[in-house]
Amino acid sequence: MGKRLISQNRGRGTPTYRAPSHKYKADLRHPRVDENTSLQGEVIDIEHDPARSAPIAKVAFENGEELFLLASEGVAVGNIIECGDDAEVKPGNIVPIGNVPEGFFICNIESKPNDGGKFVRSSGVYATVVTHEPTRTAVSMPSGNIKWLNPKCRAVVGIVAGGGRVDRPWLKAGKKYHKMKTRAAKYPRVSAVAMNPRDHPFGGGAWKHPGKPTTVSRNAPPGRKVGLIAARRTGMKR
């Protein structure tokens, strides 16, 4: 009898395929501030969070609240962070994007006002404020896509700290193994044609080839539904 495919096990949701969220430190969000006011806080620590690639800053605000915020480049222990409509537009501060001059870099941008921040949160990335209109602001995302947002959406001024991560090689499989343990992914990933026949429909044989058509029906049963699912065409486009 064959075994379940990886896609079937992933759908079942066993611990191997679940993110170890119990080890994550905090759900990053911007502090809530009343309109036309500002809130100040001091950075008391810079920490690593297994949930993300960028460092996080622990900030003690003047209202007694302590929050973890996404650290931008230049933020250090002892710095003062301002948040709100009256906050100065400088790296590390949290301000509405409608107050940010054109050409400035921003990160951890809200999708809707007061949702806490949804976009541009990976290490070393940034978005650019392009232009302002009375009811919306255009922001150039890291992908190059222009996104129009409510000018009351808040963002952190500056570039996310931890840049250059993608330029550094893994060097050892063990380092990547430990990194992947913090994600909802199975590592290493084995090629289907390298498996045994009991593990995958493309497994087995004297050499590495699928042994059957790689196109498969949309209505195929779960144990067979692998390869090019309901493909309109295969190969290079001519």
Curated annotation (Swiss-Prot):
SMART domains: Ribosomal_L2, Ribosomal_L2_C. It comes from the Archaea. SUPFAM superfamilies: Nucleic acid-binding proteins, Translation proteins SH3-like domain. Residues 1-22, 202-223 are annotated as: Disordered. One of its GO terms (cellular component) is cytosolic large ribosomal subunit. Residues 1-11 have a biased composition (Polar residues). One of its GO terms (biological process) is cytoplasmic translation. NCBIfam families: PRK09612.1. Part of the 50S ribosomal subunit. Forms a bridge to the 30S subunit in the 70S ribosome. One of the primary rRNA binding proteins. Required for association of the 30S and 50S subunits to form the 70S ribosome, for tRNA binding and peptide bond formation. It has been suggested to have peptidyltransferase activity; this is somewhat controversial. Makes several contacts with the 16S rRNA in the 70S ribosome. Belongs to the universal ribosomal protein uL2 family. This is Large ribosomal subunit protein uL2. The gene is rpl2.
